[in-house]
Amino acid sequence: QYPALKIDLMLEERVLDLPMREADVAIRLKEPSQADLIRKKLMGVNMRLYATHAYLDAHGRPERMEDLSKHRIICQNTNSAQVSAGATFTQEILTHNVDSLLTVNNYFGVLQAVLNGLGIGILPDYILQDFPEIERVLPEEESREIPVFLAYPEELRHSKRIAAFRDFVTEEIFEHRKQALESGNV
């Protein structure tokens, strides 16, 4: 729809300084604190436990939190820049005598490890719809809701390229959530 739009996607664990133009737009898993940013809540996510069907068939399906001690947990390091609700959930999982642990520095890495059958991963709820080979583990366990915000500097309020990107992201999230509701993957 916008062939001349150039996007430089940076998957960073640090908070970029938007007013200093480290980036034009950011999608953050918490409300931005800088006063001179325009912010729009896109959605809320929950962190949950996931594994492939093949992994669970081979290693068993945990029925309670204590059963996690028999599995490798794949997660982000709790000292990383992740949001508190996700870190709190991860710390809670790790209190169950987890012997085998694989930490990765971003959720894409956690997802890749899960898809390759390395264990049970802590991931955002929206991934289930796109990966039919994974299933939710311990469905009653999840983090508190984590708000996801789109943010950009006030000075870019009237930028057509920012508006195009904002509208595209908003529409894609709406469609993804709609499909998730229709398929029951919420």
Question: Can you say where each PLM-predicted feature lies in the sequence?
Answer:
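C-terminal regulatory
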Residues: M20, P32-V148, E175-V186
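Short amphipathic alpha-helical coupling segments at ligand-binding clamshell hinges
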Residues: R157-E171
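A bilobed periplasmic-binding-protein/Venus flytrap-type ligand-binding module shared by bacterial periplasmic
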Residues: V148-H158
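Generic non-transmembrane alpha-helical segments
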Residues: Q1, F168-H176
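Central regulatory/effector-binding core of bacterial HTH transcription factors
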Residues: Q1-A35, V186
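Residue-level signal for short, function-critical loop segments
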Residues: E13, H53, E154-L156
